[in-house]
């Protein structure tokens, strides 16, 4: 088991590394060439800035029972298809029971934006809080315990 992270805009890299160290779990963080990231613990893989390059590199390194941290519902769905666990930086655990609804809602929002309707992203962009970090940490701990038991 390892933790693989879509690290380009991931706000919880520090929490991931701290918990991974405590549980002695490998972490691989994926970024594109427009970002720089250094770590004394995690392996950093830098890929081209091509569309979805980070997503495909991350998924190529994902195995069953890995934990994938991503904000991308499509990546989460593919990770679940590979029998991995998937976790949003908000702490929401993606499951086979909720991913289809999330993908459908993403599709509807995209269609509304395409037709010039209200941008649903802008009104939901709240600043990250300490509570968000606590929720993420709790969810990651939950996944780590479920996999190791």
Swiss-Prot record:
Domain of life of the source: Bacteria
Pfam families given in the database record: DUF188 (PF02639)
InterPro entries referenced in this protein's UniProt entry, alphabetically: UPF0178
Region (Disordered): 112-132
Skewed-composition ranges (Basic residues): 112-128
Similarity section: Belongs to the UPF0178 family.
Name listed for the protein in its UniProt record: UPF0178 protein Cphy_3042
Origin species: Lachnoclostridium phytofermentans (strain ATCC 700394 / DSM 18823 / ISDg)
């Amino acid at each position: 088991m390892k933790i693989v992270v879509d690290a380009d805009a991931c706000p919880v890299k520090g929490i991931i590394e701290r918990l991974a160290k405590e549980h002695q779990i490998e972490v691989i963080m994926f970024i594109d060439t427009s970002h720089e990231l250094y770590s004394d613990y995690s392996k950093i893989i830098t890929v081209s800035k091509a569309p979805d390059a980070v997503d495909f590199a991350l998924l190529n390194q994902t195995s069953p029972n890995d934990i994938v941290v991503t904000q991308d519902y499509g990546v989460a769905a593919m990770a679940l298809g590979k029998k991995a666990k998937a976790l949003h930086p908000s702490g929401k655990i993606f499951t086979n029971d909720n991913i289809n609804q999330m993908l459908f809602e993403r599709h509807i929002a995209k269609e509304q934006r395409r037709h010039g309707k209200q941008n649903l992203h802008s009104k939901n962009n709240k600043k990250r809080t300490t509570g968000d970090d606590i929720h993420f940490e709790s969810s990651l701990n939950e996944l780590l315990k479920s996999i190791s038991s």
